[in-house]
């Protein structure tokens, strides 16, 4: 990992000694800059435009070199608005790629694509920075063991387990619990694995970014009183920003995560919301640079851009980055090049269901639609695999019987099917779980359930040992022993009412 133990402040006098050019052309967020012969900047170098606009306001725009055009000209993409720029303005070549602050100083703070804090909580120590462009770890550095990343969330660990150092796609509409699930994962990795999280808000709504920050403060994921004890760093490049910022903000978040993995040797969770916006921004930049579009108007370099981001997200012998990426599917078309390219990199998918959310079953993870490449006997073991398959079969049979139940009622089913339905309803409720971060809303203390406990619980339900317990005893509990205690309490309450 390349660490620059220097300041990333563009104001330093060192910049004045760098070679300078002049703006020759401005096309929206794209600038053409002329440099003296023999002093051309490299691809991905950061350029800084300084000066004043026509009203006298200070201008400070950072750009990134994308193309060398010949005739001493380069084409660069701006990372912020180009309002007020004029031809002939001086441009300074920093001589290096964009660098952002890394390490513990980033926790509890919100940054933009340039690594500048945007939360009005004062400056950040920038003595340790790292460039956002770097190659993926070499094969020799990779950890080849296939191991499960235990989240403490029953439905995830049992039916669609996450791979340590893997990539997970998170699918779900508005209001089905994506944010709460993300916050619970951030909380659990900090408590159970001693890890930290980095959240990359790529091209989403500013309001959602603000809501997430407020909810994190409310739930304790960000500690306002002692920022250093926070469990997450936030990097935002929202949809009102130029395409250059949206295209690079994912790399800024990833660079911060890589430091925690490579230098601090921690397990890191990297959230990207939304990976589709990363592709969309790349498409906009590609068009502005004059490249010929590919299928459906996307950039011809789509697979390369996606690969350069995704291949850096991996496990090394030092630590791991496990990435959870929200995936927007345009017009619900899974064959669209953007989601199709993303799917090639995913190890698991977590699908949130509006139907389950409507029933009040949270987390509303669809047990039949969610998948994982880790759910194989040689990886998770025979017991886990068999239990997961039997749970899925029971839920699938219940789904098939629902139409018959709706038309004819439960009484028309065979004895065997009625037993299947009863167990499936218990399983469905036992897949719900109280979250630590939702304590402030529900009043129920959160529960972290280990994988062994999860498997034991579902095996007991499937074996029929708990057929006598009421189904509401399984709703919003941690392990199976809590369900048994809840059933006893419910029985006592019903006797008292009588």
Curated annotation (Swiss-Prot):
Residues annotated for ATP binding in this entry: 172-179
Primary localization class, coarse: plastid
Source organism, top-level taxon: Eukaryota
One GO term (biological process): proton motive force-driven mitochondrial ATP synthesis
Originating species: Lotus japonicus (Lotus corniculatus var. japonicus)
Pfam family, one: ATP-synt_ab_N
Reaction(s) this enzyme catalyzes, per UniProt: ATP + H2O + 4 H(+)(in) = ADP + phosphate + 5 H(+)(out)
GO cellular component labels: chloroplast thylakoid membrane; mitochondrion; proton-transporting ATP synthase complex
Annotated InterPro entries: AAA+_ATPase (IPR003593), ATP-synt_VA_C (IPR055190), ATP_synth_F1_bsu (IPR005722), ATPase_a/bsu_AS (IPR020003), ATPase_alpha/beta_chains (IPR050053), ATPase_F1/V1/A1_a/bsu_N (IPR004100), ATPase_F1/V1/A1_a/bsu_N_sf (IPR036121), ATPase_F1/V1/A1_a/bsu_nucl-bd (IPR000194)
Protein keywords: ATP synthesis, ATP-binding, CF(1), Chloroplast, Hydrogen ion transport, Ion transport, Membrane, Nucleotide-binding, Plastid, Thylakoid, Translocase, Transport
Entry similarity comment: Belongs to the ATPase alpha/beta chains family.
Topology in the lipid bilayer: Peripheral membrane protein
Subunit structure: F-type ATPases have 2 components, CF(1) - the catalytic core - and CF(0) - the membrane proton channel. CF(1) has five subunits: alpha(3), beta(3), gamma(1), delta(1), epsilon(1). CF(0) has four main subunits: a(1), b(1), b'(1) and c(9-12).
Localization annotation: Plastid, Chloroplast thylakoid membrane
Function: Produces ATP from ADP in the presence of a proton gradient across the membrane. The catalytic sites are hosted primarily by the beta subunits.
GO molecular function terms listed in the Swiss-Prot or TrEMBL record: ATP binding; ATP hydrolysis activity; proton-transporting ATP synthase activity, rotational mechanism
EC number: 7.1.2.2
Listed name of the protein: ATP synthase subunit beta, chloroplastic
């Amino acid at each position: 990992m390349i660490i620059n133990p220097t300041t990333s402040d563009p104001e330093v006098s060192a910049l004045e000694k760098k070679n300078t050019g002049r703006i020759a052309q401005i096309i929206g967020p794209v600038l053409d800059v002329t440099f003296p012969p023999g002093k051309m900047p490299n691809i991905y170098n950061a350029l800084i435009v300084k000066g004043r606009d026509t009203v006298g306001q200070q201008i400070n725009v950072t750009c990134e070199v994308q193309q060398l055009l010949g005739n001493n000209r380069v084409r660069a993409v701006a990372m912020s608005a180009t309002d007020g720029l004029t031809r002939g303005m001086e441009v300074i070549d920093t001589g290096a790629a964009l660098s952002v602050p890394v390490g513990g100083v980033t926790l509890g703070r919100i940054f933009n694509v340039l690594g500048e804090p945007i939360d009005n909580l004062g400056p950040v120590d920038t003595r340790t920075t790292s460039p956002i462009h770097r190659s993926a770890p070499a094969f020799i550095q990779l950890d080849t063991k296939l191991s499960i990343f235990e989240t403490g969330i029953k439905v995830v660990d049992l039916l669609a387990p996450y791979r340590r150092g893997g990539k997970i796609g998170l699918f779900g509409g508005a209001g089905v619990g994506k944010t709460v699930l993300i916050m619970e994962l951030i909380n659990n990795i900090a408590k159970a694995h001693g890890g930290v999280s980095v959240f990359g808000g790529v091209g989403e709504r500013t309001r959602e970014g603000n809501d997430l920050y407020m909810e994190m403060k409310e739930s304790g994921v960000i500690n306002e009183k002692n920022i250093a004890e926070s469990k997450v760093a936030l990097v935002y490049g929202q949809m009102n920003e130029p395409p250059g910022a949206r295209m690079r903000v994912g790399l800024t978040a990833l660079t911060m995560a890589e430091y925690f993995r490579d230098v601090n040797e921690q397990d890191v969770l990297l959230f990207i919301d939304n990976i589709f916006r990363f592709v969309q921004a790349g498409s906009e930049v590609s068009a502005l640079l004059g490249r010929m579009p590919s299928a459906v108007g996307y950039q011809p370099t789509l697979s390369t851009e996606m690969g350069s981001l995704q291949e850096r997200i991996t496990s090394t012998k030092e630590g791991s980055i496990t990435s959870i990426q929200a995936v927007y599917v345009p017009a619900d078309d899974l064959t669209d090049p953007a989601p199709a390219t993303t799917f090639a990199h995913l190890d698991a998918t977590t699908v949130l269901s509006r139907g389950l959310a409507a029933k009040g079953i949270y987390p509303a993870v669809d047990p039949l639609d969610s998948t994982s490449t880790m759910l194989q006997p040689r990886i998770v073991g025979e017991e886990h695999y068999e239990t997961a398959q039997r749970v899925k079969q029971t839920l699938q049979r219940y789904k098939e019987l629902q139409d018959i139940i709706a038309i004819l009622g439960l009484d028309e089913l065979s004895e065997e099917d009625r037993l299947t339905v009863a167990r499936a309803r218990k399983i469905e409720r036992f897949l719900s779980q109280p979250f630590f971060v939702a304590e402030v809303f529900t009043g129920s203390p959160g529960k972290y359930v280990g994988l062994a406990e999860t498997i034991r619980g579902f095996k007991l339900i499937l074996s029929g040992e708990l057929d006598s317990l009421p189904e509401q005893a399984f709703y919003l509990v941690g392990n199976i022993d809590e369900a048994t205690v809840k059933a006893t309490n419910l029985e006592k309450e019903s006797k008292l009412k009588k």
